[in-house]
Amino acid sequence: MKVARFQKIPNGENETMIPVLTSKKASELPVSEVASILQADLQNGLNKCEVSHRRAFHGWNEFDISEDEPLWKKYISQFKNPLIMLLLASAVISVLMHQFDDAVSITVAILIVVTVAFVQEYRSEKSLEELSKLVPPECHCVREGKLEHTLARDLVPGDTVCLSVGDRVPADLRLFEAVDLSIDESSLTGETTPCSKVTAPQPAATNGDLASRSNIAFMGTLVRCGKAKGVVIGTGENSEFGEVFKMMQAEEAPKTPLQKSMDLLGKQLSFYSFGIIGIIMLVGWLLGKDILEMFTISVSLAVAAIPEGLPIVVTVTLALGVMRMVKKRAIVKKLPIVETLGCCNVICSDKTGTLTKNEMTVTHIFTSDGLHAEVTGVGYNQFGEVIVDGDVVHGFYNPAVSRIVEAGCVCNDAVIRNNTLMGKPTEGALIALAMKMGLDGLQQDYIRKAEYPFSSEQKWMAVKCVHRTQQDRPEICFMKGAYEQVIKYCTTYQSKGQTLTLTQQQRDVYQQEKARMGSAGLRVLALASGPELGQLTFLGLVGIIDPPRTGVKEAVTTLIASGVSIKMITGDSQETAVAIASRLGLYSKTSQSVSGEEIDAMDVQQLSQIVPKVAVFYRASPRHKMKIIKSLQKNGSVVAMTGDGVNDAVALKAADIGVAMGQTGTDVCKEAADMILVDDDFQTIMSAIEEGKGIYNNIKNFVRFQLSTSIAALTLISLATLMNFPNPLNAMQILWINIIMDGPPAQSLGVEPVDKDVIRKPPRNWKDSILTKNLILKILVSSIIIVCGTLFVFWRELRDNVITPRDTTMTFTCFVFFDMFNALSSRSQTKSVFEIGLCSNRMFCYAVLGSIMGQLLVIYFPPLQKVFQTESLSILDLLFLLGLTSSVCIVAEIIKKVERSREKIQKHVSSTSSSFLEV
């Protein structure tokens, strides 16, 4: 086995040694020796020059995915379509029968059809590739003595990486610091129980397999508990995960329910189309028509009538919609979620950072002896003052206040550097408070001996320390957390410099003050200190404000009005939670609030009975989210659930739409989620729901257009054959219609701008088919108008009973113009084209103009006239056709107008009856 290797990279006059170290060897060596081999500075990290030199040799910390098959092969594969092969056979037969004009025409048409299909498929693949790049993994590493937030792909061997709960390990690391560290290695070893990690060297005899290397954190594994630091020993394919990656190239993504239904619809239409086409061939042959001509037309009709492009365009529309959502700060990781967004009727949202800004500022202090202090200033900086009875407090001037500040500063993992917070906002607020009093240096005065990390279950954090200058004295514990939890560990309280026994009367005083601060919308933290966790002295309370995000109240109002119920989940007290919810318009007189303890006391059945009326879940933890989701889903709700912590991952997977926070969310949480809010803003959820509804509407518009064209083409040829008319369209003309049907005009319907009124529509029932009765009726009406209009033109031109190029040109152009007007009316199912704006969808305008220009070339350009067997038409002919074909759009607009009028009448009757009942 390879142990270590070195490569010289020229660097001017000097040469840099680039090492590679295996995880087995690194686990056996002391940390100091590993650092020496890697030429790494564990505390200060590498400098930029060293990083660039090492990357020159090792490359980026990512995997090389084998190149896809070349484009020419993908293009050739399009010819494997059975219908295309039949057309090619038709062209070959034409050559053998010396019908060279037909052979050339069919070949040109085949090339155009194949090219359009290839471009569609390539575009679909590229759109999906873009989706996979939306969430690049990130990490924290130390470089040049500073902690940096960087992309995981930037790491090189020798980098120092910091890990915390919820992180995905970005490379193979030899750990040199570990506090209560537990890592889930199931993705690598298959072992579901998290592995405890240490820093001591492992004897060679005991580290044969990966699971036994307890001082190595492997790339791709997940930190479940604790925190650590490690030095990078392997990146990319030189990591242990690199070997696994070679065996687990990504499988093809499963299709979305909508794609599956479109596949099924396509197969059903194909079945019916082949049946009808078979009858057309048989009847044509019995009527004595040319068998080769009938065969070519039938195959061309199959190409046009069978909507093979339906699933591809659906995929492209979904993918392009997802890319539009990115601009609105929402990253959708899985295409099915785009469909689900339009069905969402319940949003369960965390309060902190989603409904509120997550910009914590301490505004009030209450000491254990009843002293009140007001705090000024905002942000993570030293600008502001602590004021007691009108006097500014600084340093240790007021011991009761300074002891609270000391506890909050020492029992803290946050760092504020250059007014930038690195850590949790709540802890940042406590550091900023210490900075205002000039006590932020207290963090460095203590040496930690033990740590009890915060968890959403226990709702407190504690550290055991000794003073740096008094290490011979007993250790002291500092604790901060929810008042109800911290007070359990307290036996005494401070009053005017004295330590007194904590009585029930004193507890009641603190409880009342906590309730008063909470009802003002403040997040309340309790602080304590003492020799042991069970013998702490209560120091007091701090009130932290977290203002609501701008625009959230308006978003909440809009969503509730559209039929989406919103429920707030928070770890705060009832008073704080209800105060914030009321301010946001979430909580009304008829609303209920339920605590985490009450959720524990109920089963899913009991909770499902009251959950529709509950607007606030307070003192709730991630484990309660699972029960809330199940109770809502039991009632038939489609639930979106937000989360940011490791323990939220299970709930996010169980929800119909799991929503992770982009800024505060852990890697585990982001991986479990279906959607990531880049800015952690609740408004972004509303924008995503709006976009989801809009995308679904666009797909309905596209389906309406394509199916009406398919049905019209089939019906036209069928009726002409059964009525013993000459064929109104030849094979090349039918294939041209197919290009329009599957090409740019159709695809441009998928990118129609979202109608702003769509957010006010109620959520869609997820059981509803995309082909509603109303949509089927509109498809049939459009098809009938197109068929009748085209047959009328054909009959009108055929009155001399002799079919000429002019006859087919008029019929062909009539069908194409009908198609363009049909596409125009399909842009919206409810609004007039003038309401949405003729030019609001530029891509549609370009597509229609391009199709019309193409049609004019087919009519007037001699080489194409020969291919499509057309002849020039007069201006009067074109004006006549434009007037006739506009009828499909006019009728569609009349239907929309009637539907809107009927809807207004129903609303008026409904409001009148409700007013009557109230009276």
Swiss-Prot record:
<dbReference type="GO" id="GO:0006816">
    <property type="term" value="P:calcium ion transport"/>
</dbReference>
<dbReference type="GO" id="GO:0005794">
    <property type="term" value="C:Golgi apparatus"/>
</dbReference>
<keyword id="KW-0547">Nucleotide-binding</keyword>
<dbReference type="InterPro" id="IPR023298">
    <property type="entry name" value="ATPase_P-typ_TM_dom_sf"/>
</dbReference>
<dbReference type="GO" id="GO:0043123">
    <property type="term" value="P:positive regulation of canonical NF-kappaB signal transduction"/>
</dbReference>
<feature type="binding site">
    <location>
        <position position="304"/>
    </location>
    <ligand>
        <name>Ca(2+)</name>
    </ligand>
</feature>
<keyword id="KW-0109">Calcium transport</keyword>
<dbReference type="GO" id="GO:0006828">
    <property type="term" value="P:manganese ion transport"/>
</dbReference>
<feature type="topological domain" description="Lumenal">
    <location>
        <begin position="861"/>
        <end position="875"/>
    </location>
</feature>
<dbReference type="GO" id="GO:0140613">
    <property type="term" value="F:P-type manganese transporter activity"/>
</dbReference>
<dbReference type="GO" id="GO:0030026">
    <property type="term" value="P:intracellular manganese ion homeostasis"/>
</dbReference>
<dbReference type="GO" id="GO:0005783">
    <property type="term" value="C:endoplasmic reticulum"/>
</dbReference>
<feature type="binding site">
    <location>
        <position position="306"/>
    </location>
    <ligand>
        <name>Ca(2+)</name>
    </ligand>
</feature>
<dbReference type="GO" id="GO:0070588">
    <property type="term" value="P:calcium ion transmembrane transport"/>
</dbReference>
<dbReference type="GO" id="GO:0032580">
    <property type="term" value="C:Golgi cisterna membrane"/>
</dbReference>
<dbReference type="GO" id="GO:0005388">
    <property type="term" value="F:P-type calcium transporter activity"/>
</dbReference>
<feature type="topological domain" description="Lumenal">
    <location>
        <begin position="720"/>
        <end position="729"/>
    </location>
</feature>
<dbReference type="GO" id="GO:0016887">
    <property type="term" value="F:ATP hydrolysis activity"/>
</dbReference>
<keyword id="KW-0225">Disease variant</keyword>
<dbReference type="GO" id="GO:0030145">
    <property type="term" value="F:manganese ion binding"/>
</dbReference>
<feature type="binding site">
    <location>
        <position position="644"/>
    </location>
    <ligand>
        <name>Mg(2+)</name>
    </ligand>
</feature>
<feature type="transmembrane region" description="Helical; Name=3">
    <location>
        <begin position="263"/>
        <end position="282"/>
    </location>
</feature>
<feature type="topological domain" description="Lumenal">
    <location>
        <begin position="794"/>
        <end position="808"/>
    </location>
</feature>
<dbReference type="GO" id="GO:0032468">
    <property type="term" value="P:Golgi calcium ion homeostasis"/>
</dbReference>
<comment type="subunit">
    <text>Monomer. Homodimer.</text>
</comment>
<feature type="topological domain" description="Cytoplasmic">
    <location>
        <begin position="829"/>
        <end position="841"/>
    </location>
</feature>
<feature type="transmembrane region" description="Helical; Name=5">
    <location>
        <begin position="700"/>
        <end position="719"/>
    </location>
</feature>
<dbReference type="GO" id="GO:0033106">
    <property type="term" value="C:cis-Golgi network membrane"/>
</dbReference>
<feature type="active site" description="4-aspartylphosphate intermediate">
    <location>
        <position position="350"/>
    </location>
</feature>
<keyword id="KW-0106">Calcium</keyword>
<dbReference type="InterPro" id="IPR006413">
    <property type="entry name" value="P-type_ATPase_IIA_PMR1"/>
</dbReference>
<feature type="transmembrane region" description="Helical; Name=4">
    <location>
        <begin position="295"/>
        <end position="312"/>
    </location>
</feature>
<feature type="topological domain" description="Cytoplasmic">
    <location>
        <begin position="313"/>
        <end position="699"/>
    </location>
</feature>
<dbReference type="InterPro" id="IPR001757">
    <property type="entry name" value="P_typ_ATPase"/>
</dbReference>
<feature type="binding site">
    <location>
        <position position="648"/>
    </location>
    <ligand>
        <name>Mg(2+)</name>
    </ligand>
</feature>
<dbReference type="InterPro" id="IPR044492">
    <property type="entry name" value="P_typ_ATPase_HD_dom"/>
</dbReference>
<dbReference type="GO" id="GO:0042998">
    <property type="term" value="P:positive regulation of Golgi to plasma membrane protein transport"/>
</dbReference>
<dbReference type="Pfam" id="PF13246">
    <property type="entry name" value="Cation_ATPase"/>
</dbReference>
<dbReference type="GO" id="GO:0005509">
    <property type="term" value="F:calcium ion binding"/>
</dbReference>
<keyword id="KW-0333">Golgi apparatus</keyword>
<dbReference type="GO" id="GO:0032472">
    <property type="term" value="P:Golgi calcium ion transport"/>
</dbReference>
<keyword id="KW-0812">Transmembrane</keyword>
